[in-house]
Amino acid sequence: MYIHERENWTDFHWENSAIDALIELASRKIGLLYGRLNNLGFDNKLRAMAENLTHDVVQSSEIEGISLNTEEVRSSIARHLGIDNLKYTAPSHYVESVVKVMLDAIEHYMQPLTKETLCRWQSAFFPTGFSDGFPIEVGCYRTHEEHIVSGIFGKERIHYIAPAPQLVENEMANFIQWFNQPPSTSSIVQSGIAHLWFVSIHPFEDGNGRLARILSDILLAKSDKNEFRFYNISAEINRNKKQYYSILEQTQHGNGDITSWLTWYIKTLIASVEDAETSVNSILNKSFFWQRNASVIMTDRQTQIMNMFLDGYEAKITSKTWAALGNCSKDTAIRDIQDLVAKGVLREEFPGAKRPCYAIVYDPEDLTSWFSDTQIEEENGTFYLLTTYKGKQNVRNRLLRLDAERYMKGDLSQQSLLNKYCAYLMDNPK
């Protein structure tokens, strides 16, 4: 029996004792994140949100097996938000449509949800009326049975059968009415319920997962009372896709007890906020760098390339990379780099190496004395820097894969690693 076949199936219940501590932790982390954002000016906040939205759009689509060009998405979002983008990539019509849905949801997050809005968003996901080469119903609720299956043709496994099409209109009316009411429980719990409830109705022929994640974000935005969105759950779901579908299937076959689902959902939300903290830290580091180097004279090319690396461009700083990014000769690149070394902006990572590479000097002080128990941890293919600042503040920052691999091979010093990911702490001592 599927969950929707039970009488009063949306009277979900759960064990508060199992999730109360998680709700408190999630709320505290969200509060700390927004507190940290007070250190950012408006332009930097906008850039942080743009980067978060870029990851959200790309990862949410990837969950459904759709690969989008990250630079196209980033360029589209930057244009809509009025942000200068040095690496503009003309977005496709499809990317533009998907981005507009996300921005529309953010801009109007306080407005009541309607059937018309949902149908408009779903239609924007499929501007040609096709999905995976097959025609689908767009801009309206589905009119046929919906089976969630996996496996090859002829040997499919049915994971879930959604409510019959003649029931969808009424089921969605109940959902929308509930969605628009003031929450009777924690907004974090409400967000998790909305996600589960919507995908269990599966009102559209395609696009339900992406819409469910947007609806979850809207409820969190209402709770935060903030149109700036700095965290999203899509990337974490994509990293743990098997767990996501497993817990979803388990709950949809259950008796209405959604404790396991909420536990998984809130833990995933917490992880997404931790990732957002890393992005904010990167922006704070960049701001800290430019404040320290405000009086340093650089050419336009030097400034542009430095900003690329400060924004997370994943490559070693070498004369070869510099020449490629600056569209200049290797000799010019060497002169650029040596000039910045002389000015204390860059330093040679391992002096005397046959193929020299360089590190950005965020803070000229050797930060290693301020940190202890520094290590790298891998979790679901993502690397994190774990360290303790001044013996009392635990730090956990997501690393670029290249930095993690270089550090573990001894090709990146601990000083450079801490400088790149933790220098912002020196500007905000505790």
Each model region followed by its residue ranges:
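Acidic, low-complexity, intrinsically disordered interaction modules
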Residues: 386-410
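FIC/Doc superfamily catalytic core
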Residues: 1-382, 390, 414-430
